[in-house]
Amino acid sequence: MEVIEIKGIPLASRQPVVLAIGKFDGLHLGHQAILRAALGGVRQSEVKNSSGESVQLSVMTFWPHPLWALLHKPGYERMLTPPLEQTRVLHEMGVQRLFRVHFTPEYANITAEDFVFTHLPRMGVMQVVVGVDFSFGRGGKAGPEDLRGLCEKIGIPVQIVPPVAMAGEKVSSSHIRNLLAEGQVKEAAVLLGRPYTIVGQVISGRSLGRQMGFPTANLADSGSYVLPVAGVYGVEVQVDGGKERWLGAFNLGSRPTVHGHGLQAEVHLLNFAGDLYGHDLRVSFLTRIRDEQKFSGVVELKRQIERDVEEVRRLDRSKNG
């Protein structure tokens, strides 16, 4: 997949594309519906395309999150799918070209007319696909129907995709953020269509887990991922993006029993032997085991960790049969 960074007016391209536009934070089921509609547009456009070049499925997205770039809204400095993770997932979903807009107050000041009449034609756009909540132009005052009306003037059709609902509630990134803030990782996975995943590099720690018989990998917090609420989770882990997966017990919190400080993340992998220091771990959240707790001492903490690990083993047994 080709990634094109946009910091102003896009460079001119003759490559024809069907363009899905949105923040796509999380790439949840609603976003996936937009991408499926865009893929349908690609197939239709290939029939009509007279240039001889294949039409590419393309996405335009924005980074950092507009709510952070413009308002510094707390929490939105982190994303459900930061740029690297978003790129990986979009590639897996079959997107061929990604236009990533560096979203700034200056970019936000572009008028709706400039966006449609200047930007889109330079990107080789044959069709645009957006969701019903899409907004654009100065102050975000223009919506999907405004986009359709402007694009009609230059012969670009616009498809507006209705929202996806689960249990009577619209699937949205903000809803998923709220679920993670409550530790409801199973429910978040339903809306995402996959487990919620973060990536972190293993850093050195105090080796307290190893002293208790449960060696853990301590993960650096890059500050880019939305994190679930503190607690203990059953997770699945890949090392350096490899295909092999290990179940693990993941702890996120301040480790009050051993006088920890600040938010720390660590994971104990079941049936793993090896040195993980310096490696990147992809951690997918499967279930929440318990809240963070302060115990009377290390002995009680060790007993609880044993119970946590046994809970993860039960996950393995239920998964395999």
PLM regions and their residue ranges:
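Short acidic-hydrophobic, aromatic-tinged amphipathic segments that line or gate anion-handling sites
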Residues: E2-I9
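N-terminal catalytic cores of NTP/NDP-binding nucleotidyl/phosphoryl-transfer enzymes
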Residues: P10-E77, P82
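Residue-level signal for inorganic ion chemistry
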Residues: H28, L90, V128, A188, ...
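N-terminal Rossmann-like or analogous alpha/beta NTP/dinucleotide-binding catalytic cores
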Residues: P66-V132, F136-I154
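Glycine-rich, Lys/Arg-enriched anion-binding loops that position phosphate/diphosphate groups
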Residues: G149-G253
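Phosphate/ribose-recognition catalytic cores of enzymes acting on nucleotide-derived substrates
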Residues: G205-G321
